[in-house]
Amino acid sequence: YPIGTGAWKVIQYDTDQQIIVQANEDYYEGAPEIKQVTFVKMDNEAAFSNAKSGQLDIVMVAPNYALEEIDGMHIENLETMDVRNISLPCIPEQVVKNPDGNEVTVGNNVTSDVAVRKALSIGIDRESIINNALNGIGKPATGFTTNLSWGNPLVYEDNQREEAKKLLEDAGWIDSDGDGIREKDGVKCEFDVYSPSSDQQRYLLAVAVAEDAKELGISINAKQGTWDELTAKANTDGIVWGWGQYSPTVLKSLLYSELFLVGDYDNTVGYSNEEVDKLIDEAIDSNNQEDAIKKWKEVQAVSAEDYPYLYIVNIEHSYFVNDSIDISVDTQIAHPHGHGSPIICNMKDWKVNE
C-alpha cells in the first residue's frame, strides 16, 4: 500500500445506497479488530425500524427517538460542537442594492434593537428549552463552542427574567395595551423565526424558544420552509441554523461585514463591527497559532456584546449501538455539524465485546 494509506479500504461503493469497507491488514498501527463495515443510506424512520429488527448495529437518531428502547442495543449521546442558534438581523428594515445591483429588502425593525437581542440571550431558559424540544439531550450554548482551543471564552447565566424585562423597558419596549406583547413607537415586539421543513428538531427548538420568549413579552412566530424559502428570508427574519466546524474561519462567515449579501449563508444578519473585522483579518493573516487563537477568542468576545445570534444548544449526537460493539467512546472526538460522520473517526479502535 502507498504511504498514507489508512486503516480501511473501500471494496464496494453503490451510489446513494451503501459503502462497504474492509480492514487494511497492513495498516501501520495494526489492523482493526472489526474486519468489515457496511454503511447504508436510509432516512431516520427506516434506520430506526431496521435497528429494531436487528439489521443494523449502529444508527444515528434524533432526540425524539433517543428515549426509545431497542433490545440488544444501548444509547450513546456523544459530545459535539454542533450548535443551534437563531440569526437576529442587526439592521432596521430597509431597501438596499445587492452586489448584482438589484434592490432587496433587508433588516428587521424588532431584532435590530440590541436590547431585544440581549434580552433574549440573557432571558431565555436554555435548560427548559432543551428539555422541551430535545428530550433534555444537549448542553446549553451561549456561544459558538467551548470545547475547541479557539472556542468561545464567555459563558454567562441565562434565565435572568427580571433583568431582561428591565432591559426591554429601559429601551422603550412596553406592553401598553395589555396583550402580553411589548411595543415601541407603534411596532410590536414580534418577529418570525424559520426552520427547514426537513429538520423537525430545529422547528421544535424554535417553538420552545417562542414559548419561553412570551415570558419576556416578545412574540416569536415559529415557521417552516424549504431551504430556498429560508435563504430568501434570511436577511429579514430569524433562521434556526446549525453550525459546527473544527476551523475558526466559520466565524468569518458569521460576522465579517463585507460578506453581507454576498452568499446565501454568510453574515445574513448584516452584522458590522470594524473592530471585529480587524480582528478577523489579523487572525487569518497570523502565522502564529497562539496569536491566531487569541485573536479568534477576541472576535467572539467583542461580537458577543452585540448579540447578533441567539445561541441555544450544543446538541449531542445520539446513536443506538449494538451491545456487542464497543465504539471506544474515550477516543471519540467532539463531533462537528451533522453533515460529517465523526462517529467513524476512531473506527479502527472499535472492538467486539466478549
Task: Describe each region flagged by the PLM.
Residues 137-156, 317-322:
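Mature extracytoplasmic/periplasmic domains
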Residues 139, 249, 270, 341-344:
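Low-complexity, intrinsically disordered regions enriched in charged/polar residues
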Residues 312:
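Active-site-proximal polar cores
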Residues 2, 7-133, 149-179, 187-308, ...:
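Extracytoplasmic/periplasmic ligand-capture domains
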Residues 321-354:
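Long beta-strand-rich cores associated with HINT superfamily self-processing modules
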Residues 74, 256, 317, 335-339:
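Histidine (H) residue identity feature
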